């Protein structure tokens, strides 16, 4: 039976600074790099052996994957990078301190923006310092100005079905290094979690989540590798 391993990137600089990150490209911290390496060591110790890997086009996820693979002695594995595995776009909240935003708009409004299923934050304003339209990695892509979790799912799941599911169907073990909300999209799909419940699911940084996948690509079991 194939396995699907999900790992959220190690702590990023803006995780540390408590800022909304979204699509902005932020590196991992020293702690985040250590989390990624430890995840690779754990997978190696537990006998998890990916055949192929997927990640976003964001540095924190790519670096987490590379560090984990290096710790496993599997840097030679094929890796596919795709923007559809990016974090949710936080729109006009990008770069803002979460506590200051709550003080300005109220805890409840910020909770709605962060944790509602289908209500996106305000859009990113034209000319913002966080505008990514000139970033070459997004050439030819209609960059969103903001996204809800529902919007994120709408790009993640078609990519999963088209690119990742066929690898699992071929019996390959797949490792995905991505982000809190793009991974929520996959967990919601695989575990059949409701719209209301998925918004409360926390995915910790640097902790491999393992899915045992049936032949029909349904999920038989989900668990944290550290608990086995």
UniProtKB/Swiss-Prot annotation:
It is an enzyme of class 5 (isomerase). One of its GO terms (molecular function) is phosphoglycerate mutase activity. It comes from the Bacteria. InterPro entries: His_Pase_superF_clade-1 (IPR013078), His_PPase_superfam (IPR029033), PG/BPGM_mutase_AS (IPR001345), Phosphogly_mut1 (IPR005952). The record marks 179 as: Transition state stabilizer. The active site is at residues 9, 87. Substrate binds at residues 8-15, 21-22, 60, 87-90, 98, 114-115, 180-181. It catalyses: (2R)-2-phosphoglycerate = (2R)-3-phosphoglycerate. HAMAP family: PGAM_GpmA. Catalyzes the interconversion of 2-phosphoglycerate and 3-phosphoglycerate. Homodimer. This is 2,3-bisphosphoglycerate-dependent phosphoglycerate mutase. It comes from Sphingopyxis alaskensis (strain DSM 13593 / LMG 18877 / RB2256) (Sphingomonas alaskensis). The gene is gpmA.
